Amino acid sequence: MATSVNGSHRRPHYLLVTFPAQGHINPALQLANRLIHHGATVTYSTAVSAHRRMGEPPSTKGLSFAWFTDGFDDGLKSFEDQKIYMSELKRCGSNALRDIIKANLDATTETEPITGVIYSVLVPWVSTVAREFHLPTTLLWIEPATVLDIYYYYFNTSYKHLFDVEPIKLPKLPLITTGDLPSFLQPSKALPSALVTLREHIEALETESNPKILVNTFSALEHDALTSVEKLKMIPIGPLVSSSEGKTDLFKSSDEDYTKWLDSKLERSVIYISLGTHADDLPEKHMEALTHGVLATNRPFLWIVREKNPEEKKKNRFLELIRGSDRGLVVGWCSQTAVLAHCAVGCFVTHCGWNSTLESLESGVPVVAFPQFADQCTTAKLVEDTWRIGVKVKVGEEGDVDGEEIRRCLEKVMSGGEEAEEMRENAEKWKAMAVDAAAEGGPSDLNLKGFVDEDE
């Protein structure tokens, strides 16, 4: 129970710390608002580099911000920077968080003392700092619960042998292949720095006597995965998705011409294509296949292309092809929840980032899954075989894919045939359950309320 120095009741005050990337910040701010709704106060902390990319933070009673330097306040300039970034983030961030917590606990004013720390994926060092001040910690997991289970079993020597035989059978999880694993665990795509950080996450959870994890999912979607690892108390509190008005998306632009364009299209006729904030890193052969596949359908499309370097992108012949089509519209940004909620959208071509997948689920839009890295490979497996709301693009061992495969997937979802109707019906079913879970009094809402009440 949170109490003041004189013994009176104090509401919980959470320090919420996230990795400085959009995919981490947006769900964290959704969580902050919901924690405040249930009577808590929140200090949100991430790197200055993210603050500079964001719009003006929301002015919300009970929400304050504490920015810290990660050593790269102007952002990463090259791949070489990425090799040392994680260690610098840990070093700079740890020192900054110590100062933030110490200043808060030493305050003699009416400032509410921090009573707990919540930290997201890729910053496991936050839990170490929190323990120095004897503050309880909670992990905010912003990927599928299934992915956390996989990492737990992979880094636990008692289960490591299960990954030596295919198909891989893990407790309470669907059968998977090596290609369905998060890319960091695939031999051909392993990233040593990511593996170190993920291992540290599991080790941090192992040090807790009763580790608690707030998971951006909902019980109906991942019931078995949420109870797969008996030691971990996973609390489903999702989907943490912004409203279709996009008022809490601090990274959106003011370009809304796409709305009028969508209004002019027939119901369920538009292919919406967005491959996330790292779409600029899409391999050229994937961009080529995607371009030819989309154009071959002769269907209207809305394509999100984020140009970091406009002059360089002008040289991209595939970008010129899609811009030259009279059937499509290319924009730099959009309110994704608003687009997915539009009746003209019939299909979502996505990289299967977890935020995008949840937004698709909550909107009831079937998908063509084109995963690239990290948890996206596992999510695509769930999309196609478990939730059955879309189809996954088949990619060769060397990452090869052609335009015909893209066209095949799009037609399978958009054709109106028996399989397409089944996907759409499943999407509508999951939409209803997703909306119900996050609604006031819904399962996820009650779970979060219970989490806050335990700390009061």
UniProtKB/Swiss-Prot annotation:
EC number: 2.4.1.-
GO molecular function, one term: UDP-glucosyltransferase activity
Induction text: By PAP1.
Residues annotated for an anthocyanidin binding in this entry: H24, A374
Role summary: Catalyzes the glycosylation of anthocyanins from UDP-glucose.
UniProt record similarity statement: Belongs to the UDP-glycosyltransferase family.
Name under which the protein is recorded: UDP-glycosyltransferase 75C1
